[in-house]
Amino acid sequence: MSLITCENLTLAYDTGVVASGVSFTLEAGSYLCIVGENGSGKSTLLKSVIGLHPVDGGTLTVDPSVRKSGIGYLPQHTPAQRDFPASVREIVRSGCLKRSGLCPFWRASDKKLADEAMARMGIDHLAGRCYRELSGGQQQRVLLARAYCATGKLILLDEPIAGLDPMAMTEMYRMIADLNREGVAVVMVSHDVSAAVQYATHILHMGKTTSFFGTTEAYLATPVGQQFARREGGSYGDWNPKTAWDAPDIGRILDVRAAPDARSVLGARGVSLNRNLTATRRRGGAASNREGEDT
């Protein structure tokens, strides 16, 4: 069952297009990591899924049952959020607002769900504390608990580990993985490629002129996937997109219909990923098929 279907999507602001030609599907229970250079439209894509940003081209379809039951959303952490003057319990319960409808008070089921969410995130002892008094890691746990209360099907996370210390990062990844193992589909924007390939079932790589979608295994079979998997920490901080994507061995892949687990867009014309990978295996090195390469 597809929860999200995206076909040839274009996203833009008044200043111009930030992403184009983006295509992917998210199946129930999947774990999708969205990676890519800064400014490539990753956060904007999440906002479009929940209806906070319009689509400028292509189609973006969210399963009606998911929209009805709610989508959990953990946005990027901002200074305004860190200073929010509310208790942990109040913030977590606010995740139940959509399911509560017009009910003017918290139902017993809402309170129970919020209590369960706080317990599983290890913050039940902080229920009465003010949110702005907590550490960054504790605040992220609160927001993850809130997102969990909003849905049992789909959670969108925008750089949930940004600014966390290594121990807090490990705990956050573990809790997200636990939710996914219980059947909750996860879409996470991250610059931590090493973690993305460790936890995700699928990778969406977004760039100003490039887009890849496929299984983690297919991503790691591409030269660019291998390059980033080797990078310590998987950070994009000093990545040069021209060096990575304009290298002769990357080819120009447009539509991989022969490999259902991978669809890629690189430039205006394309060749099969299977042909590129086959050439790589035969030659024991980088694929040299440059058919369709921009001139």
Functional labels for PLM-detected ranges:
Residues 155-158:
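Catalytic Walker B motif of ABC-type/P-loop ATPase nucleotide-binding domains
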Residues 190-191:
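H-loop/switch region of ABC-family ATPase nucleotide-binding domains
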Residues 203-215:
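H-loop (His-switch) and adjacent beta-strand-loop-beta switch element
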